[in-house]
């Protein structure tokens, strides 16, 4: 159904669920979108109904609030599903498998990091002690382990912190152990499903030449289920408790979430008798927060919760109950007492409760919202005095509903320095020319700080605006331009362009001057960057020469990066050839951006391949992981491009020194000696690498290299230029006084460059003293180490490195 399910035989109920998680009721045939889906396997829910998700590299995300509140409006954040891990490294979290690792068939750089996270579980079993309450459990099916994070509040959302430092709750040396799902049982213990497969990777992501050597079905009949329990812990639940009404209500206070949810489900299975309703109303006064929570929901869904009872829940001492009571209150907002209480809760002491209060007010029917507009705006303005994160900002703007321009105007008039995030969020939600004109008029006549005006204009310039005919907006823009700095002028020029209005004379004059000012080294770097923003709107021919001059590594980094950004927006094939010609002179950071320009803009593929074929660009500098290789090998319609790329590398990877690797392969089967390996490391590697407490920090630290397979480590030793982190490319720096230094760029900023040489010696040179800085295109690590190592010495070194640093 292409992600658009409907009830059998009733196509009128079709609902677009693409990219969404959802829930449904069989008896009422009701479907409801929950919110954005991570796309991964598993969905965890805590005792208060908050959802946690997982997907491959991103092991734990929190659905901060459901999409139903947004209704397709453009918001400050594009996603309400937020990565909450506080232990990320370059976009994913480090994990600690045990035993000798297999070679990765793709993305070897992901070894030792989450890449197959799944089966997420919020543990609510209550059987493992307080230490494991409020924990998230996530399996990594690739690295054969189960990881545990502790969940704590973080503003209106949460953060996930590692429970065990440099180790996992469960890890296996059996490479066929594939945990894919977990669930809490009636006993409060965790049940783990082990899919058990020797090969877990999807065939699409296994290079064909490697796939031919693998048995993709190995282990498929050996799946199993494990139970994780705590010694001395026993279940305190008797299933007979479910046989009586009193037992069901009492079960709502059980420490095991499974028991509570099952009792809740059974109580909701039929209409409530007076006896059960009476028991639940008594439970609202219980000392147990879980029983109060479930009683409130059951009574409300059965239509038996009174206004006074709900008001009591809205004042509950437990934050999670107040949060849930606000969701219940959405059906009671036509009651003045409830509405007044919800408005007052915009200033609740808890940040997440404040967010939910605003979200609840966003559901207020239009007529009632208009009737209460003045009072609403008063409470919303007061709420801006509270500490806020982006989620609070978004919820406040949603609560404003159609009165956003009134809220914008009142904010800038009543508050000396209103939060620019709120102003920008309001701007994002405007949907017609009249609202745009009102916003611009308010800006033109305001005394807002320049930084706030700048942010609002930047937000507007990034929106899609329809063309406009009339003088009102023109007059407002001219009013703002009177005191505009270069960054503001640039944003206004973009806005004018989108509206179909001509650029102002002030902008035209300033942008012409900017061509000279960008290269004026007497100006501060920040002022020069502002001049770059003015240049952005000029035709490419007028700024072409300037942009390439800005790529020189003697220019400030921000200038280089802005130049490459502007070049990336143009579609002139000669740009690629010019960049390749300049390749050796590009700084390390700029070269990373330039490599993406050459690879991901197809008109530059010929320039890229020519540079690789001629050796101007070292193949290792392009970080050709599987997806980047396939951009040239598979995902282009240009047959010639595919053929040229296939001569440089295969789908399986980049190998420059196959003969040397084949000659040393027997070392992989020899028994290594760690003590002898330590001697080899000291003699061959320690001059540039740190391992444990030994060595010099020039190249990458090898402290965690044991997360890689022996085969992968040997490949990196013998073929150091097949894939080089651009931070470790060798450079030649020549000073104006004639000094020459060769090493890696250890530090590069707008003022100076630090070169680190073999052995760890560092030299720092001011940019003004640099005559030339050029890339040598290769790793500082030399090729040919196989000439100084026997196969046994290689085996010893590999064993030493895989053993783990002390």
What are the language-model segments listed below?
Residues 1-249, 257, 264-281, 287-343, ...:
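Beta-propeller blade termini and top-face loops
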């Amino acid at each position: 159904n292409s992600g658009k399910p409907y009830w059998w035989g009733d196509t009128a109920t079709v609902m677009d669920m693409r990219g969404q998680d959802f829930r449904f009721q069989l008896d009422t045939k009701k479907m409801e979108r929950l919110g954005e889906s991570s796309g991964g396997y598993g969905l965890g829910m805590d005792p208060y109904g908050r959802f946690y998700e997982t997907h491959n590299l991103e092991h734990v995300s929190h659905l901060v609030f459901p999409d139903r509140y947004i209704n397709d409006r453009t918001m400050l954040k594009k996603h309400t599903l937020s990565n909450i891990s506080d232990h990320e490294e370059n976009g994913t979290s480090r994990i600690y498998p045990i035993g000798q690792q297999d070679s990765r068939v793709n993305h070897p750089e992901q070894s030792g990091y989450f890449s197959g996270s799944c089966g997420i579980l919020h543990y609510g079993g209550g059987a493992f002690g307080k230490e494991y309450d409020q924990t998230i459990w996530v399996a990594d099916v690739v690295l054969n382990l189960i990881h545990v994070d502790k969940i704590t509040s973080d503003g209106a959302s949460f953060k996930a912190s590692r429970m065990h430092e440099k180790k996992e709750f469960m890890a296996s040396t059996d490479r066929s152990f594939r945990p894919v799902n977990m669930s809490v049982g009636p006993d409060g213990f965790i049940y783990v499903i082990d899919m058990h497969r020797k090969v877990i990777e999807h065939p699409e992501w296994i290079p064909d030449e490697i796939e031919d050597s693998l048995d993709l079905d190995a282990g498929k009949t050996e799946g199993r289920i494990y139970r994780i329990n705590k010694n001395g812990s026993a279940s305190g639940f008797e299933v007979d408790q479910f046989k009586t009404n009193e037992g069901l209500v009492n079960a709502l206070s059980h420490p095991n979430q499974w028991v509570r949810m099952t009792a809740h489900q059974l109580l909701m299975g039929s209409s409530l008798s007076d006896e059960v309703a009476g028991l639940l109303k008594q439970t609202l006064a219980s000392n147990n927060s879980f029983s109060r929570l479930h009683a409130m929901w059951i009574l409300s869904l059965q239509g038996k919760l009174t206004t006074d009872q709900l008001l009591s829940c809205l004042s509950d001492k437990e934050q999670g109950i107040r949060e849930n009571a606000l969701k219940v209150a959405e059906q009671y907002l036509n009651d003045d007492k409830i509405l007044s209480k919800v408005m007052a809760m915009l200033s609740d002491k808890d940040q997440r409760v404040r967010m939910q209060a605003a979200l609840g007010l966003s559901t207020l029917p239009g007529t009632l919202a208009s009737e209460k507009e003045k009072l609403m705006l008063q409470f919303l303005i007061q709420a801006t005095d509270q500490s806020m994160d982006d989620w609070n900002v978004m919820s406040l703007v949603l609560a404003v509903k159609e009165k956003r321009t009134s809220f914008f105007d009142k904010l800038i008039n009543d508050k000396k320095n209103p939060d620019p995030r709120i102003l920008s969020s309001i701007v994002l939600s405007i949907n017609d020319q009249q609202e745009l004109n009102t916003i611009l008029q308010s800006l033109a006549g305001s005394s807002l700080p320049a930084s706030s005006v700048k942010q609002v204009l930047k937000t507007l310039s990034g929106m899609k605006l329809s063309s406009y005919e009339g003088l009102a907006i023109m007059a407002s823009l001219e009013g703002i331009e009177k005191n505009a700095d270069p960054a503001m002028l640039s944003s206004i020029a973009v806005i004018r362009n989108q509206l179909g209005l001509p650029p102002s004379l002030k902008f035209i004059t300033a942008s012409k001057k900017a061509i000279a000012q960008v290269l004026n080294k007497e100006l501060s770097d920040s002022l020069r960057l502002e001049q770059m923003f003015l240049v952005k709107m000029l035709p490419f021919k007028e700024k072409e020469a300037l942009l390439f001059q800005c790529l020189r590594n003697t220019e400030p980094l921000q200038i280089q990066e802005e130049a490459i950004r502007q070049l990336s927006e143009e579609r002139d094939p000669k740009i690629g050839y010019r960049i390749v010609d300049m390749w050796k002179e590009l700084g390390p950071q700029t070269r990373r951006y330039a490599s993406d320009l050459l690879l991901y803009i197809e008109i530059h593929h010929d320039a890229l391949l020519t540079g690789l074929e001629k050796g101007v660009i070292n193949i290792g500098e392009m970080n050709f992981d599987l997806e980047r290789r396939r951009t040239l090998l598979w995902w282009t319609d240009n047959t010639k491009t595919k053929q040229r790329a296939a001569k440089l590398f295969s789908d399986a990877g980049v190998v420059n020194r196959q003969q040397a690797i084949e000659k040393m392969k027997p070392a992989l089967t020899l028994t290594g000696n760690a003590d002898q390996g330590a001697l080899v490391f000291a003699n061959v590697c320690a001059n540039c690498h740190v391992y444990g407490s030994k060595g010099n920090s020039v190249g990458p630290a090898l402290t965690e290299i044991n997360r890689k397979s022996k085969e992968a480590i040997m490949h990196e030793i013998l073929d150091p230029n097949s894939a080089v982190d651009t931070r470790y490319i060798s450079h030649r720096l020549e000073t104006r006084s004639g000094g020459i230094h060769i090493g890696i760029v250890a530090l590069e900023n707008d003022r100076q460059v630090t070169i680190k040489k073999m052995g760890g010696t560092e030299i720092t040179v001011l940019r003004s003293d640099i005559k030339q800085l050029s890339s040598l295109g290769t790793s500082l690590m030399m090729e040919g180490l196989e000439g100084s190592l026997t196969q046994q010495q290689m085996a010893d070194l590999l064993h030493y490195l895989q053993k783990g640093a002390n």
